[in-house]
Design a protein with these regions (language model features):
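Conserved RecA-like ASCE P-loop NTPase motor core of nucleic-acid helicases/translocases
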Residues: 1, 272-274, 345-352, 356-357, ...
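A substrate-engagement module of RecA-like helicase motors
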Residues: 1-99, 107, 169-179, 194-208, ...
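Signature of the SF2 helicase/ATPase Hel1-core->accessory helical subdomain module
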Residues: 5, 81-98, 103-200, 273-290, ...
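A contiguous, basic/glycine-rich beta-loop/short-helix subdomain that forms a polymer-engagement track
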Residues: 74-96, 110-116, 204-319, 326-328, ...
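Conserved interdomain hinge at the start of the Helicase C-terminal
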Residues: 262-263, 317-352
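Conserved RecA-like P-loop NTPase helicase motor core
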Residues: 316-327, 382-492
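Conserved helicase motor "Helicase C" RecA-like lobe of SF1/SF2 P-loop NTPases
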Residues: 352-381
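N-terminal targeting/trafficking signals and adjacent low-complexity tails
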Residues: 442, 452-453, 457, 487-533
Length: 533
């Protein structure tokens, strides 16, 4: 939404320009479909039938109008001319000055748009660039599961039964002799052969009379697996098999997406990556495959913010290790009471898990703060849908003295802007480290071998954790006029390897809980005097 609004601002600024400015927002086919559940078949869908006959008038209307063509506008014109809105947006994109879309249109090797590949006149603007590496890693990951095979086996016709049974035998072979849990395996030759045979049979029109949904789902899983077998440098991938009581899952995982991301970005004239969370730069350059280009081609924009805008304090005497969390709860309550009494306002509290958040909620709501008027308290619930989250946001922004507890790394702690409802502070409890896993340990081993032992732990565990921390903290300072307090609750934030991820304008102070009152009072008093001057 922020990018779309910025595009509209550009359009308004260009209103008197000599040339018409055209922008288009690409929306996923499933979300833009005007007939829910309708197959993409010209014999069945009125919006697909005769598409290219009806396209010229629809396209002409959009080009003549210019401006920003968001999902709503594209759908309105598509209905008027009875054409598919998704295909219309793609065709309009070739006439547009600016195209807004998800990463997958450029980076996903399966669904990336062929019309935009290797276009030297196109410049990439990559928003939320701290998400680029994990997103591309997920795009390069493929899997086949016994549950998909079993579902297809129960409904497939005779012409496919032999191929499905071969898949079932092959996936069982990958797990032979393995205990329940996740394991690394060296090769998947038997599964690869079974997948190839299944695809050959499925794609042979004489062998398939009726392609049931379960069979189709297995087909796409196998197609992804087959494509993944030929992707890029094998040293950056590993095979994992997870054995459960009633299922087997075989995955090909990507440990390092940087090399592929670099290949994609090099196809275009330039790439600008946007994020407030790209420190230290060498880490993100490594993740994005840009280390080899850094000396000649990379430049970093200077931050528009200054150290006087925020007071960053590390609370060094509230450890948040799992076994110490019960003892931390009353101390976190005291910290919030101190902040809200010193400066009533809106405070965001980010915690590393729902379980920890729920424990805190019971303690916080049951205590007496000692304040004349306690702040309102809202919290993010497990499994909240988008509508419920928006209602929570609306209630939070409407209040003047309020604390909202959210989960670190969730939709309410990243990529959200509170607009005119400015925050007075953000409190981040714990590091939010990813739980140990075989996949992350393999990633740590890979980067340790490639770039040194210290980088392994950093890439696999510290970077994803600190990206979430800095994103949550970034909800506070959104413009040069904003002011506020950031509290990092955990003595581990004193470590140099974690402080390397802090923005350059932060000047953190490490203090105890009993020092917070004087520290924040001094900051707000100094800020008030500076504004008066």
């Amino acid at each position: 939404d922020a990018l779309l609004n910025a595009t509209k601002d550009i359009t308004r600024a260009n209103a008197n320009g000599a040339e018409q400015f055209i922008a288009v927002q690409l929306t996923a086919k499933e979300k833009s479909c005007l007939v829910a559940g309708m197959p993409c078949n010209a014999d069945l869908c009125e919006y697909a039938a005769g598409y290219y006959d009806k396209l010229p008038k629809a396209l002409e209307q959009l080009i003549q109008q210019g401006g920003v063509n968001d999902q709503g506008h594209i759908e309105a014109v598509a209905k008027q001319h009875q054409v598919c809105p998704f295909e219309l947006s793609l065709d309009l994109a070739t006439w547009s000055d600016l195209i807004i879309g998800d990463y997958n249109y450029i980076f996903d090797p399966v669904v990336r748009l062929q019309r935009f590949i290797a276009q030297p006149n196109i410049h990439l603007l990559v928003d939320e660039a701290h998400q680029l590496s994990p997103r591309v890693q997920s795009m390069l990951g493929v899997e086949v599961t016994s549950l998909e095979i079993r579902a297809a086996k129960s409904c497939s016709n005779k012409s496919m039964s032999k191929s499905v049974l071969s898949l079932e035998r092959a996936i069982k072979k990958t797990a032979k002799g393995l205990a329940q849990g996740e394991h690394e395996i060296i090769q998947t030759v038997s599964l690869d052969r079974a997948v190839t045979k299944f695809l050959e049979n499925y794609e042979h029109p004489e062998l398939v009379e009726d392609r049931e949904p379960e069979l189709e789902a297995l087909y796409f899983a196998c197609l992804g697996w087959a494509r993944g077998a030929s992707w890029f440098e094998k040293k950056r991938f590993r095979y994992l098999v997870e054995v459960k009581e009633k299922s087997i899952q075989v995955r090909q995982i990507c440990l390092d997406a940087g090399h592929y991301a670099d290949q994609v970005m090099s196809e275009y004239a330039s790439t600008v990556r946007f994020s407030a969370t790209v420190s230290p730069l060498n880490i993100y350059q490594q993740l994005h495959g840009q280390v080899i280009h850094e000396a000649r081609f990379s430049e970093r924009a200077r931050t528009p913010f200054s150290s006087v805008q925020t007071h960053v304090i590390i609370i060094k005497d509230i450890p948040t290790y799992l076994q110490q969390r019960p003892q931390s709860l009353p101390k976190i309550c005291t910290l919030l009471d101190t902040l809200t009494i010193s400066k009533p306002g809106r405070y965001l509290l980010a915690m590393p898990s729902y379980a920890y958040l729920e424990q805190f909620r019971y303690v916080y709501q049951g205590r007496s703060s000692g304040a004349a008027q306690s702040p309102e308290f809202f919290y993010q619930e497990r499994g909240q849908n988008a509508q419920a989250q928006q209602q929570l946001m609306d209630a939070f922004t409407a209040a003047d003295n309020v604390v909202m507890a959210v989960v670190l790394g969730g939709g309410l702690s990243e990529s959200v802007d509170f607009g005119e409802a400015k925050l007075s502070g953000v409190v981040i409890v714990g590091l939010g480290l990813p739980p140990p896993s075989l996949e992350r340990n393999l990633m740590a081993e890979f980067f340790a071998a490639e770039a040194g032992a210290e980088l392994g732990q950093t890439m696999a565990y510290n970077q994803p954790a600190m990206a979430r921390v800095i994103q949550a903290a970034g909800r506070l300072i959104r413009s040069p006029e904003d002011r506020g307090v950031i509290c990092l609750v955990d003595p581990r934030f004193e470590r140099r390897e974690l402080q390397n991820f802090f923005p350059s304008y932060w000047q953190p102070q490490s203090i105890g809980l009993n020092e917070v009152k004087n520290s924040v009072n001094s900051y707000w008093l100094h800020d008030m005097k500076a504004r008066e001057d």
